[in-house]
C-alpha cells in the first residue's frame, strides 16, 4: 500500500447516557481497497455504550474494554506505572468502557453489562469472541502479534490466524468505609499457546485455556487507606499487591507498597504496577512521599526495590535485583510560573558481552536529570523550556551520554479562533542507548512522544482553527534533521537521507 496513514472516526453521544461510534484506521504501507485488503481500512472498531438505564449501570456492545481491581486478573487500561503521581498511583480500575481508540490489541469484542443489585452492590458480566493476529505453526500458537501492522505478505499471513473467547464477571461492594471486589475470568484460544522455549520464557502463559480469580479490597479510616488485590491462576499460583496510603492535610501523600508476582503466575490480560511489563516473575517494595517542604516548594520522591526470581529477556541469570529511585523538587510561586528539577536513578542487572565475547550479568546504571520551566502570560502565551541529560553504563564500562534542550510556545489568538504551537529541540547522544524522549503536542487522538538519539534538531508546528462551532481544522508539521547520519531507520522504514518529516491533517465536524 501507499505510505500514508489515515483514520476516520465518528462518535455520537446523548447526554451522559448513550455513546456510539466507529473508528477506522489504515497504517502507512497497508493496502487500501486493493491487494489483500478489499474492504478499505485495515481496522474497524464499532461500539455502543449505554449508561444508567434503570438498574443497568453500563451496557456495552461491540468493542469495549474492562479493568477490575488493581489489574492482577484483567486490565486493558493505559497506565503510567511508577511514574504516575502519588495521588493517582494505585487507583482502582474503572470497570466497563467503550473502545474508541485505534489500538488493535487491548480490547474485547462482544457484550458487557454492569447491573446494580442493590444500593451498594454491583454485578458485572462480559463475553468476548474475537479473531487475533499471531504466528501459528504445527497447530500451536507461537506468539501473539500486537502491533496491528498488515503491510507485507508475511504480515498478512499472521492476520486473524487464531481466535480467543473470554467470559468473566465482577462482583463489587462499595461501602462507606470499604470497597470489596471479586473478579473471575476464563479465556480460551482455539489452539494451544506454546511459544518456542527460550531461557527467559519457560513460565510464559502456555496452554489452550486460562482462568484467574482475584479479590480486591480498599479500606478507609480517617486519612489512612489500605488497598490491594490477590489473584490465583488455574494452577494455584498466585500474585498479590498491597498498599498503605496516608494522606494528611496539605496535599501530602505517603505510600508504602509491596508486590509479589510468582514466576509461574499466568494471566493473559493482567497488567499492574511493577518494573516489568507483565504480572509475573517479580517482587518488590515501594515507598513514596509527596509533600510541601516550603511555601511554594513541593517534593516528590520514591524508592522501588525489586527482585526477579527467574531469568528475563537479556538477563540469563536467575535471581537478579535492582533499584529505581526518583527525587523531584517543584517550585510554583504563582499560577503563571512553575518549574521543577527531577533526578531518577535506576540500577538493574543485565547481560553484558565483553570484547573477548565472554558474557556476564552485571549491573546497568541509568541516571536521568530534567529541568522544566512553564510560564504563561494572561492565558494567551504559554512557554515551556526543557533540559534533559541521561547517562547509562554497565559497571566498570564506559558510559553513554545524551543531552536534549527544547523550547515550545503556545499562543491563543483572541481576535481569531486560532491556536498555534511551536516547538524546537536540539539533541546530542552517543548512541541509541542514551536516547531521550519528550512529549510533543499533536492533533487530537494522536499521542506523540518521539525519541531522539545521535545528533540533530527537531522542529514542529501545530495549528488549530475553529471555523465555527461545528468545524475544527487542525494540522501539524514536524521535521527532524540529523547532523551525523545519511540514513534514518532501517528495513521498510529506511530513509535515504538525513531528514525525516511528518505531516498530520485533521478535520472535525461537530453536530
Language model features with spans:
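Exposed, low-structure sequence patches enriched in small/polar residues
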Residues: 3-5, 162-195, 202-511
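Surface-exposed loop/turn segments flanking beta-strands in extracellular/periplasmic regions
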Residues: 80-91, 137-153, 441-446
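Conserved catalytic-core segments centered on acid/base and nucleophilic motifs
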Residues: 10, 48, 59, 113, ...
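Aromatic- and glycine-enriched pocket-lining scaffold segments that form the walls
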Residues: 105-152, 160-162, 166-170
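Outer-membrane beta-barrel proteins
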Residues: 25-43, 97-104, 157-160, 231-233, ...
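Outer-membrane beta-barrel translocator/receptor signature
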Residues: 2-7, 12-20, 24-30, 36-44, ...
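Outer membrane beta-barrel
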Residues: 38-96, 100-133, 248-267, 417-432
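Beta-stranded membrane pore/translocator domains
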Residues: 2-3, 36-41, 59-63, 127, ...
Amino acid at each position: 500500500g501507499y505510505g500514508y496513514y489515515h483514520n476516520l472516526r465518528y462518535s455520537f453521544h446523548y447526554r451522559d447516557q448513550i455513546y456510539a461510534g466507529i473508528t477506522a484506521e489504515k497504517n502507512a504501507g497497508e493496502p487500501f481497497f486493493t491487494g489483500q485488503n478489499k474492504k478499505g481500512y485495515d481496522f474497524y472498531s464499532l461500539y455502543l455504550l449505554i449508561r444508567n438505564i434503570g438498574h443497568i449501570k453500563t451496557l456495552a456492545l461491540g468493542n469495549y474494554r474492562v479493568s477490575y481491581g488493581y489489574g492482577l486478573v484483567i486490565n486493558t487500561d493505559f497506565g503510567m506505572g511508577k511514574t504516575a503521581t502519588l495521588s493517582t498511583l494505585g487507583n482502582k480500575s474503572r470497570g466497563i468502557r467503550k473502545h474508541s481508540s485505534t489500538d488493535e490489541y487491548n480490547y474485547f469484542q462482544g457484550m458487557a453489562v454492569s447491573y446494580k443489585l442493590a444500593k451498594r452492590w454491583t454485578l458485572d458480566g462480559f463475553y468476548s469472541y474475537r479473531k487475533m493476529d499471531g504466528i501459528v505453526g504445527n497447530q500451536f500458537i507461537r506468539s501473539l502479534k500486537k502491533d496491528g501492522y498488515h503491510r507485507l505478505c508475511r504480515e498478512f499471513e499472521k492476520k486473524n490466524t487464531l481466535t480467543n473467547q473470554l467470559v468473566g464477571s465482577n462482583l463489587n461492594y462499595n461501602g462507606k468505609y470499604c470497597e470489596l471486589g471479586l473478579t473471575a475470568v476464563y479465556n480460551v484460544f482455539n489452539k494451544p499457546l506454546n511459544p518456542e522455549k527460550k531461557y527467559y520464557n519457560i513460565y510464559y502463559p502456555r496452554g489452550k485455556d486460562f482462568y484467574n480469580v482475584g479479590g480486591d479490597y480498599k479500606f478507609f479510616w480517617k486519612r489512612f487507606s489500605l488497598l490491594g488485590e490477590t489473584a490465583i491462576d488455574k494452577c494455584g499460583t498466585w500474585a498479590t499487591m498491597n498498599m498503605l496510603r496516608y494522606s494528611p492535610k496539605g496535599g501530602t501523600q505517603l505510600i508504602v507498597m509491596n508486590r509479589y508476582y510468582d514466576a509461574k503466575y499466568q494471566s493473559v490480560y493482567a497488567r499492574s504496577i511493577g518494573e516489568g511489563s507483565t504480572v509475573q516473575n517479580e517482587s518488590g517494595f515501594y515507598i513514596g512521599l509527596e509533600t510541601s517542604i516550603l511555601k511554594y516548594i513541593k517534593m516528590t520522591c520514591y524508592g522501588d526495590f525489586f527482585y526477579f526470581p527467574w531469568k528475563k529477556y537479556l538477563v540469563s541469570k536467575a535471581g537478579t535485583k535492582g533499584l529505581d529511585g526518583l527525587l523531584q523538587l517543584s517550585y510554583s510561586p504563582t499560577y503563571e510560573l512553575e518549574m521543577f528539577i527531577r533526578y531518577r536513578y535506576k540500577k538493574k542487572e543485565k547481560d553484558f558481552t565483553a570484547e573477548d565475547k565472554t558474557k556476564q550479568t552485571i549491573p546497568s546504571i541509568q541516571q536521568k536529570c530534567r529541568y522544566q520551566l512553564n510560564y504563561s502570560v494572561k492565558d494567551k502565551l504559554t512557554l515551556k523550556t526543557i533540559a534533559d541529560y541521561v547517562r547509562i553504563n554497565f559497571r566498570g564500562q564506559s558510559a553513554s551520554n545524551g543531552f536534549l534542550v527544547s523550547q515550545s510556545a503556545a499562543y491563543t489568538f483572541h481576535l481569531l479562533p486560532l491556536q498555534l504551537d511551536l516547538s524546537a529541540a536540539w539533541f546530542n547522544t552517543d548512541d541509541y542507548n542514551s536516547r531521550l524522549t519528550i512529549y510533543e503536542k499533536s492533533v487530537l487522538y494522536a499521542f506523540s512522544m518521539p525519541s531522539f538519539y545521535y545528533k540533530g534538531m527537531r522542529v514542529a508546528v501545530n495549528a488549530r482553527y475553529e471555523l465555527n462551532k461545528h468545524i475544527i481544522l487542525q494540522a501539524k508539521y514536524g521535521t527532524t534533521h540529523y547532523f551525523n547520519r545519511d540514513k534514518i531507520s532501517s528495513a521498510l522504514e529506511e530513509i535515504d537521507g538525513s531528514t525525516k518529516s511528518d505531516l498530520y491533517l485533521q478535520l472535525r465536524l461537530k453536530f
